[in-house]
Amino acid sequence: MFAYFRGKLTSVLPEEVVVEVSGIAYQFLISAATHRQLPEQGSEVFLFSHLVVREDLLQLYGFSGEEERQLFRLLLLTTGVGPKLALALLSGLSVQDIHDAILTNTPERLYGITGVGKKTAARIILELRDKVLKLSPVSALASPARLSSTLLRDDAVNALVTLGFSRIIVQKAVVAILEQNPGLTVEEVIKAALVSIHNS
């Protein structure tokens, strides 16, 4: 129904924003990934959108990129996955990480996201593999650089989890750090993540 919205960013919370378009304020639920891409409050913002319609609810979801919205819609096709869980996945992992987990049949990469257990992770991979492959066939052949980055991220996450930190908190911190500084070593990522977690 709505492809996208462009307007003034009037309110910003960790999981939702309000965008004013022609005098009408629209509330969007967003992922942590989209939150990181937002401009300053009061600036113009562009969000791709998805409208969830239920008997007692009309809820808009906003995305900084088309790929994220596309994956959100695919996740909703999975048995047992609703908007809340789909958004949690997109907050805890990058679009590419979820694609890689699906295409390489590694459900353990999805563990740790609130609400995602072994059965749910297995269903996501089983039900979405062909759909993700059609969307991005090149992703099936992960480049050495991307594989290296994925292994580095997993090593950093696993190391921090062994120190007693929550996997979902660690994943969010590590993903954010690698997005900003993709050239870091595992040790540097761990140190930066520890600082980020303690400061949050």
UniProtKB/Swiss-Prot annotation:
Subunit details: Homotetramer. Forms an RuvA(8)-RuvB(12)-Holliday junction (HJ) complex. HJ DNA is sandwiched between 2 RuvA tetramers; dsDNA enters through RuvA and exits via RuvB. An RuvB hexamer assembles on each DNA strand where it exits the tetramer. Each RuvB hexamer is contacted by two RuvA subunits (via domain III) on 2 adjacent RuvB subunits; this complex drives branch migration. In the full resolvosome a probable DNA-RuvA(4)-RuvB(12)-RuvC(2) complex forms which resolves the HJ.
Q: What is this protein called?
A: Holliday junction branch migration complex subunit RuvA
Task: State the protein's purpose.
Answer: The RuvA-RuvB-RuvC complex processes Holliday junction (HJ) DNA during genetic recombination and DNA repair, while the RuvA-RuvB complex plays an important role in the rescue of blocked DNA replication forks via replication fork reversal (RFR). RuvA specifically binds to HJ cruciform DNA, conferring on it an open structure. The RuvB hexamer acts as an ATP-dependent pump, pulling dsDNA into and through the RuvAB complex. HJ branch migration allows RuvC to scan DNA until it finds its consensus sequence, where it cleaves and resolves the cruciform DNA.
Q: Which gene encodes it?
A: ruvA
GO (cellular component) term, any one: Holliday junction resolvase complex
A single MF term (Gene Ontology) = four-way junction DNA binding
Where does the record place the region Flexible linker? Answer: 144-154
> To which species is this protein native?
Pelodictyon phaeoclathratiforme (strain DSM 5477 / BU-1)
**A single GO BP:** DNA recombination
Q: Which InterPro entries match?
A: DNA_helicase_Holl-junc_RuvA_I, Hlx-hairpin-Hlx_DNA-bd_motif, NA-bd_OB-fold, RuvA, RuvA_2-like, RuvA_C, RuvA_C_sf
Record bears the keyword DNA-binding: yes
Its annotated compartments are:
Cytoplasm
